[in-house]
């Protein structure tokens, strides 16, 4: 005689799964929005606060090589803030020259990247759809190689018996090798080469979003191609130009590897000064003060870019 088994009943979800599903239903949107803020706090705000704390300390022969800001002794809390690290930056002209040269090199390099990157982005945007992805790949492909290896490759190209000088001697353009390596010119070449893709991609994105009926209307109304370019196309791609300029200018200010390997003793950029203070002099408080001032200088273009983005969003809806 067969026995009838009771129908299998579905088990209620476990306590943790039930709690997780309820949390997702109630606060899922807030959690998704909170993730980037947590990322920014952990990787940007927290390191900034640590560097700022070190900048207010004093140098010490210890590990780590700085004093603590707060000490508890004899039942009392003593707080020691040292502003002398920031005052030292104003006393020594080396730091001012390093800031000034870093801003100058970054600005000129950004302008050169724009002159090279805009035609490249234009060529990619107006190429056939079948070849567009290949051209984009060629723009991005060098970035897949180690940055250090690419800079070392430029050392081989620019040195006195390198590829460039040998080629110019073979053509008969020059009679003796040109001194390019370990000069400011080599620094400009290295930075422009390294950061051109960061200029090309935002401009390319802006170019493919243009409504070219506006360009045709300008030409139909009698505007010449050059005037149409500067009065119609350039304003429509202004967002891409500004975004690309920020992507080039901001990292170029603090560049260390390129000035160290391609530059000479006159290439005094803030990245080299930071390395000197941190690792050679082991003066972490002064190095932290140098880094804080550099970050404050970079906040100005970042805020300007943010203001422009908000203005663009307001104009377009």
Curated annotation (Swiss-Prot):
Instruction: Give the domain of life.
Output: Bacteria
Q: How does it sit in the membrane?
A: Multi-pass membrane protein
What residue ranges lie in the Periplasmic compartment?
52-104, 154-184, 260-284
Residue ranges of the TM segments: 32-51, 105-124, 134-153, 185-204, 240-259, 285-304
Q: Where is the ABC transmembrane type-1 domain?
A: 99-305
Cytoplasmic face of the membrane: 1-31, 125-133, 205-239, 305-317
State its location(s). Answer: Cell inner membrane
The record's section on InterPro entries has:
MetI-like, MetI-like_sf
Activity regulation behaviour: Transport is feedback inhibited by intracellular polyamines.
Tell me which UniProt keywords the record has, alphabetically: Cell inner membrane, Cell membrane, Membrane, Transmembrane, Transmembrane helix, Transport
State any GO CC term: ATP-binding cassette (ABC) transporter complex, substrate-binding subunit-containing
Among SUPFAM superfamilies, the record links this protein to: MetI-like
Q: Name one GO biological process term.
A: transmembrane transport
Give the record's family classification.
Belongs to the binding-protein-dependent transport system permease family. CysTW subfamily.
Oligomer status and interactors:
The complex is composed of two ATP-binding proteins (PotG), two transmembrane proteins (PotH and PotI) and a solute-binding protein (PotF).
Record function comment = Part of the ABC transporter complex PotFGHI involved in putrescine uptake. Responsible for the translocation of the substrate across the membrane. Imports putrescine for maintenance of the optimal concentration of polyamines necessary for cell growth in the presence of glucose.
| The protein's name in its UniProt record | Putrescine transport system permease protein PotH
What lineage is on file?
Bacteria, Pseudomonadati, Pseudomonadota, Gammaproteobacteria, Enterobacterales
């Amino acid at each position: 005689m067969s026995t009838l088994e009771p129908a299998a009943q579905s088990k209620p979800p476990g306590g943790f799964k039930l709690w997780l599903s309820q949390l997702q239903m109630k606060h899922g949107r807030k959690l998704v929005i909170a993730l980037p803020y947590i990322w920014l706090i952990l990787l940007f705000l927290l390191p900034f606060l640590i560097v700022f704390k070190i900048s207010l300390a004093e140098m010490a022969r210890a590990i780590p090589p700085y004093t603590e800001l707060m000490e508890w002794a004899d039942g009392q809390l003593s707080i020691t803030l040292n502003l002398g690290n920031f005052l030292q930056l104003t006393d020594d002209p080396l730091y001012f020259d390093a800031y000034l040269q870093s801003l100058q090199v970054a600005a000129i390099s950004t302008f050169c990247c724009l002159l090279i990157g805009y035609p490249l982005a234009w060529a990619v945007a107006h190429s056939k759809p079948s070849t567009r992805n290949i051209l984009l790949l060629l723009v991005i492909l060098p970035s897949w190689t180690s940055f250090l290896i690419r800079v070392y490759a430029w050392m081989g190209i620019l040195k006195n018996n390198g590829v460039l000088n040998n080629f110019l001697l073979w053509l008969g353009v020059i009679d003796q090798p040109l001194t390019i390596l370990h000069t400011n010119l080599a620094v400009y070449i290295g930075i422009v080469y390294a950061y051109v893709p960061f200029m090309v991609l935002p401009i390319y994105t802006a170019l493919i979003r243009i409504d070219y009926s506006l360009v045709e209307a300008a030409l139909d109304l009698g505007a010449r191609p050059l005037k149409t370019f500067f009065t119609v196309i350039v304003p429509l791609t202004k967002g891409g130009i500004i975004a690309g300029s920020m992507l080039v200018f901001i990292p170029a200010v603090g560049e260390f590897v390129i000035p160290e390997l391609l530059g000479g003793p006159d290439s005094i950029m803030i990245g080299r000064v930071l390395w000197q203070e941190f690792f050679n002099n082991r003066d972490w408080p002064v190095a932290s003060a140098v880094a804080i001032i550099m970050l404050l200088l970079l906040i100005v273009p970042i805020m300007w870019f943010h203001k422009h983005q908000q203005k663009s969003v307001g104009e377009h809806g």
